[in-house]
């Protein structure tokens, strides 16, 4: 069963990021870096066309939730998951990521901006369980040092991936 929910979203100036798709080679490396398995629940914040979650479900058996402010992208992602037979593992929600409950996530993926990542850091640290993994494409989190970084090449160029692991409380 595919769940698509819509929540009233009021964009805050400076929070919107352009819809720039993560190259598929980078998607695969993000999932590998986070060591995503079938036992994971992956949350993609700013899920765009759903490609990260679709790869996580299709290739690694994970479940996932995509949070996206653009209703057209939410519908597109949900339809693609349905067509691929992944609707029972994925849900896509039109929701402001600062309003979302992230507590079920074991992995969070991001391709936002350095500013948004830094603003999300307190939420991630307070809502995610110790050991949860966070992977960001291209953008760091200021003074929170990543556990690992990885350089990945694609047809679109070179990409830096950052991995953080939520520490124990």
Kindly label every feature range from the protein language model.
Residues 6-40, 74-104:
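S-adenosyl-L-methionine
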Residues 39-48:
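Conserved class I S-adenosyl-L-methionine
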Residues 50-54:
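Glycine-rich SAM-binding Motif I of class I
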Residues 63-68:
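Conserved SAM-binding motif I beta-strand of class I
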Residues 103-119:
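A short SAM/SAH-binding and catalytic strip from SAM-dependent methyltransferases
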Residues 115-169:
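C-terminal substrate-binding/active-site "lid" region of AdoMet-derived donor-dependent transferases
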């Amino acid at each position: 069963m595919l769940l698509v929910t819509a929540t009233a979203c009021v964009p805050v100036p400076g929070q919107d990021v352009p819809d720039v798709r993560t190259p598929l080679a980078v998607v695969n490396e993000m999932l590998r870096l986070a060591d995503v398995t079938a036992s994971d629940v992956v949350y993609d914040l700013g899920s765009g066309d759903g490609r990260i979650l679709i790869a996580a479900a299709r290739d690694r058996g994970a479940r996932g939730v995509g949070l996206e402010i653009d209703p057209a992208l939410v519908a597109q992602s949900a339809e693609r998951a349905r067509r691929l037979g992944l609707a029972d593992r994925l849900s896509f929600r039109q929701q402001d990521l600062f309003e979302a409950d992230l507590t079920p996530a074991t992995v969070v993926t991001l391709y936002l901006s350095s500013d948004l990542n830094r603003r999300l850091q307190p939420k991630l640290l307070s809502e995610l369980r110790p050991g949860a993994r966070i992977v960001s494409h291209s953008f760091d989190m200021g003074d929170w040092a990543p556990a690992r970084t990885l350089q990945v090449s694609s047809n679109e160029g070179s990409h830096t991936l950052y991995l953080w692991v939520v520490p124990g409380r």
